[in-house]
Amino acid sequence: MIKHISLDFWNTLMVSNKIFSKLRLDFLKKEFFQNISIEELSIQIETIGDESDTINMKEGISIPSEVMYQRLFSKFDLEITTTQAEKIYNDLEVLFLDNPPISIYDLDELKRYLKALRNNGYTTNISSNTAFIKGRTLKKIFNDYDLLDYFDFLIFSDEINSSKPSSKFFKELEKECKNLNVSKNSILHIGDSFEADIKGAEAFKIKSKLINIDDKKLIQLLIGLEN
């Protein structure tokens, strides 16, 4: 019997804000890459993101955001220190918070169904891999959207140095659920990535459900659980 719902974040609940993506490019070009085209810079940011995701998922680690920015600079034969990378992150965080991720669903409707689940005895959490954006920043988004009260805990890969689909990540989920007196066989993990969310959960003997961002079926799924 399902008693706990674990939700992925990116492309399950929210998508990145294109305005932030543009402002990040503008900031980096103006401050550091004046001789690099926006197009080339965009390609390399995407490449670093893809490369990092592949490594994280294959090795079960979580490459820090600072290292990702250092690798971006190295693509153009430039070097920055960890301190400089931290400064860049902090500057970009301001832009990110001003142009936050966009909810796939109507937030009031999502909150209503999450509240109904919790009123029916379910516990809930977020289980998310991170990349350029740290968990600490995403927590600020949850606070700004008044979503924190709808989840018992949040797991972000950078905070445990482990990414889905690794068993270490899902072991953390199991541990947190045990603190709520919920056993592993009572957890349902929901996400959009077959590799990270479904295969990872199933390898750790946790039930899972794949949803497609284009279908927008999460609300229907939550209604089904409620009933």
Annotate each language-model stretch with its function:
Residues 2-106, 120:
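N-terminal helical cap/lid subdomain that shapes the substrate entry/recognition surface
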Residues 1-7, 15-18, 33, 39-40, ...:
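Asp-based, Mg2+/Mn2+-dependent phosphohydrolase catalytic module
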